[in-house]
Design a protein with these regions (language model features):
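Metal-associated gating/positioning segment near the N- to mid-region
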Residues: 78-146
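Active-site-adjacent C-terminal substructures of enzyme catalytic domains
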Residues: 262, 272-389, 401-408, 413-415, ...
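N-terminal metal-binding scaffold of metallo-dependent hydrolase/deaminase domains
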Residues: 10-72, 408
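Metal-coordinating catalytic core of metallo-dependent amide/deamination hydrolases
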Residues: 126-148, 152-153, 160-273
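Non-catalytic positions within long, well-ordered alpha-helices that form the structural scaffold/packing
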Residues: 155, 227-228, 257, 280, ...
């Protein structure tokens, strides 16, 4: 029996328990392992046909298998959730978002529709600079309330973990405020957040023409304060022609690593700039965007532990060429896909749109895209040992679909087919009329 399809906009919790027995599953589909999957192996999912069951105890998966074989002692005190024949996949990991920001840039979107480029708008004082002004003027409460709207929508689409970056402050006070909002959000809603410091998103107006001085300001003043307050675990930078060069990137990321941060990089988005090679050399968790990655960059990532995080909704929004996902997978890269939610180049956190673009325009299979959005997304934030697959010992993060097979994620174009999102055993069911 098929579940009624949900409305994506309204989410209610139906079961709040860390001990949960999920029964009557039509099919379980998951990648397996504790690290990123490279190349064509991304398409090799572990499939369990139903009637299947999953047991979560104390928020951790304790059983995955046939419903008829569930040990009775495992489910004695469990809340029961009936999947009604729906497929179950791992909770989605959105490994690249700019979740916390002030203001909107709807007029810039109209300018791009009329032919203006993203970089021309940015160089004219729009783009990141306009969001920086609005974010600096926003209160903690305003930033938190705006982010909550996006998080509720993301939860309804199956996201259980997300990266959240700062980078719209670019001064000490506002960068700390953004990260404090992320910390508050972690305590006030279900999605687990991975906090990333991205003060090096651009050079702010007060450092205009002095980008190297700005990097030193981040290294000497901002990063140590972020570290001492425990507000972020990762450091990111926009390595791009006209933004930050390789020398500046090395300076910031090497300093961040010495302080105990993991590393990420926005790389090769606008022009081929050798960012992928540099990310692999520095041991970044991920190199993100990669619309203009070179052959050398593909080879470097394929021979490294750095995940290639692709952001198809951004290419779609910018009317840009998509990252060469098919070539990257065929040459052995570990690929993740993520939303890049932000107020400028991609005002969307739509999992259905992202999934369809990856399959239709980037040449990825339904299986590869599922791996990219789960286990490889988890690896891109350093959490593949804890989340990203449905295996005993991992966190109880699941998505119950309204259809009996995961392939409907790409087949039912543009539609949210998530019936329920399960986070650590707590069930959040989309509102159904």
């Amino acid at each position: 029996m098929l579940l009624a399809l949900p409305r994506a906009s309204l989410v209610l919790y139906s079961v709040m328990s860390h001990n949960l027995y999920v029964k009557n599953i039509g099919k379980v589909a998951t990648p397996k392992g504790n690290k990123a999957i490279h190349g064509k192996a991304m398409g090799e999912l572990d499939i369990l046909m139903g009637p299947a069951a999953i047991v979560i105890r104390d928020g951790i998966i304790a059983y995955v298998g046939k419903e008829s074989e569930v040990p009775g002692d495992l489910i004695q005190d469990c809340a029961v959730y009936d999947a009604q024949g729906g497929a179950v996949v791992p909770g989605f990991v959105d490994s690249h978002t700019h979740l916390v920001f002030g203001g909107f840039r709807e007029e810039e979107f109209q300018m791009r529709l009329r032919g203006a480029s993203y970089m021309s708008i940015m160089q004219a004082g729009g783009g990141i600079a306009s969001t920086t002004k609005a974010t600096r003027e926003a209160s903690v409460e305003e930033l938190e309330a705006a982010a909550q709207v996006h998080l509720r929508a993301m939860l309804s689409m199956g996201v259980t973990t997300a990266d959240a970056k700062s980078g719209y402050g670019m001064d000490l006070e506002t960068e700390l405020r953004q990260l404090e909002v992320i910390q508050r959000l972690q305590k006030s809603q279900p999605i687990a957040l991975h906090a990333t410091f991205m003060g090096a998103h651009d050079t702010p107006p007060e450092f205009k023409g002095r980008s190297t001085d700005y990097i030193e300001y981040l290294v000497q003043t901002v990063l140590p304060e972020v570290k001492s307050r425990g507000l972020a675990e990762c450091c990111d930078i926009f390595t791009e022609e006209g933004v930050f060069d390789h020398e500046q990137t090395r300076r910031l990321l090497n300093a961040a690593r010495a302080m105990g941060f993991t590393l990420k990089m926005h790389a090769d988005e606008i022009v081929p700039f050798g960012g992928a090679e540099l990310a692999a050399e520095l041991g970044c968790l991920s190199a993100d965007h990669l619309l203009q990655i070179s052959e050398k960059g593909i080879a470097a990532l394929a021979n490294s532990n750095t995940v290639a995080t692709l952001l198809p909704c951004t290419a779609f929004s910018l009317k840009a060429a998509y990252a060469p996902a098919r070539k990257m997978i065929d040459n052995g890269c570990a690929v993740a896909v993520a939303s890049d939610l932000n107020p400028g180049s991609c005002f969307s956190a739509s999992i259905p749109l992202m999934y369809d673009l990856a399959c239709i325009y980037m040449g990825m299979t339904a299986e590869e895209t599922l791996t990219a959005l789960t286990l490889n997304g988890a690896a891109a934030i350093g959490r593949a040992d804890r989340i990203g697959s449905i295996e005993v010992g991992k966190e109880g993060d699941l998505v119950v679909l309204g259809y009996p097979c995961y392939k409907f994620l790409s087949y039912h174009i543009g539609m949210n087919i998530v019936h329920s999102t399960i986070k650590g055993g707590a069930v959040y069911t989309n509102h159904i009329d």
